[in-house]
Amino acid sequence: MRVKKMLAAGMAVTMAASMALSGCSSSAKSGADVTNAGANTESSSSTGESKAENEIKKPEKITIMVNATVMTKQNNRDAFEKRWEELTGIDLEIVQPDHDAYFDVLGQTFASGPENWPDAIILAGSFYTGYAEEGALWDMTQAWENSELKSSGRFTGDDVVDNMKIDGKLYGFPVTRGNGCVTYVKKKWLDNCGLTAPTTYDEYLNMLKAFTEGDPDGNGVNGDTYGLSAAGFIGTEEPWTNYLPEFYQDAYPSFAKGEDGVWYDGFTKDNFKEALQRMRDAYAAGYIDKETLTNGTKDCRNKFYEDKFGVFTYWAGTWASNLKNNLESNGHDSELIPLKPIKEVGTYVERTAPVWAITSSCENPEGVFKYLIESMLDGGEMEMLWTYGVEDVHWSKKAETVLDKAYNEGEFHLKESLENPGTQYTKQHLDPMLAIATWEGDPGKAAVKDEAKNAQTVFNENCRQATITPSTEEMATYNGDLMTLKKSIIADVVVQGTSIDEAFKRFESDGGVKWSQTIVDSLNKKESAK
């Protein structure tokens, strides 16, 4: 296992955090807990062997590191943890960094040594392929092939699972589809400006201009709003461009495979320079939130709820209901239009699904797969917990009124959000609209709101599936520094107004061209070896 490179280099695939964050030593396992980690890794990870279902030992304890897609403290994670332990008889320890810092803290945890690694983690995109390449993840291929879920007849996501295989092996399990982002526009703002939903980039830019210079919120003041906001000019994970698709269009800031089967770095192409020019022009005109560079997703959502801007590219499906509910709770008009992709964008991108992965230091990976991951889709009480939460905390069937809506005895409904009072929950970790296994007893099927269905339909009918980028030794070595440099170049051009020619001269002088070509060569070498 090549984890020694991680320990020495701090796991370059973590995309080189731009700020220092504290690690997770307080939740670390003791050294004795992983004394046999190397032996376990060699026997299970390298061979892909897995025990039969009836031979799997139930773990006494499972430690997981997760982001805020899993129940947070504010949403009574303690109640979730207690219920999970009641259902399994297993002690569950949850390590949960701030959502926007998750991959940074995870990288620091990996770099601190296998004795500190959790048993299971949530990964996505290049983080998944990178950690797999480094030997940090357990090969769960046979565990999945031998699982009760696969043979149950209920599983419908074979294409999703197959898309996550690396050289035919599965190192992480997706429990839902990947989903993606759709551009939402406040209808009232369009109406106030006398506009219709844009279908081209020129119309889109004209809308941003009107939302910035006019009076779209109808408060009688021109110019006290702006067009859009985003959590950075480039995402924190693949597909990188999903928060600003109208500006990127056909450009891509990282590695992709052409129709000819040859890998290339999209950052070095002319169409990426054109995308930078579009972003810089819109930013200079004031159409884009001046805090975009440092925004987190929560910052953007709060500004949207406060009616500071009118165009927000965010997740399809249940997030349409979340956005609507929060606008209403802030006293603003809540009707949103999910746009079809403008002509120059063509299609939205469905990201590769986030996965649950088991680290190679885990002493009982088969047990963790069975009792933690596979059980999430059991079509029963555990799936209920991961989808809707805890009864009488996050959902209920009692006769009551929630936010002015009366429910009868026995009628399933979601409770008022603990984190965002004035709104109702829509889901927990599992999104029922992205399900990859049938669940006949799903009590919340009828509770999915029309706006969520509409947004998901717009996305599903106008998206393409992203594919994972394989990792190589060169990718693991250079891509962290390369992405840091790329983000710096983008910030210089868009925010500081640096000329594109000067910015790309720095890209070459600071090593970007060399790193990029080295990675491209390694990807094409790997491709030709298939």
Per-region residue spans from a language model:
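Helix-loop-helix "hinge/cap" segment bordering the ligand-binding cleft or interdomain interface
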Residues: 165-238, 255-299, 303, 358-370, ...
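Extracytoplasmic/periplasmic substrate-binding proteins
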Residues: 129, 233-254, 277, 283-423
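Conserved small-residue motifs centered on glycine
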Residues: 67, 370-491, 497
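Loop/turn elements at helix/coil->beta-strand transitions in domains of secreted/extracellular proteins
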Residues: 58-62, 88-92, 113-119, 136, ...
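Sec-dependent N-terminal signal peptides
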Residues: 5-16
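C-terminal motif of bacterial Sec signal peptides marking the signal peptidase cleavage site
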Residues: 18-23
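Conserved N-terminal structural module of periplasmic/extracytoplasmic solute-binding proteins
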Residues: 8-10, 25-203, 255, 263-267, ...
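Short, solvent-exposed loop/beta-turn-alpha elements that line the ligand-binding surface or hinge
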Residues: 54-55, 139-156, 196, 250-270, ...
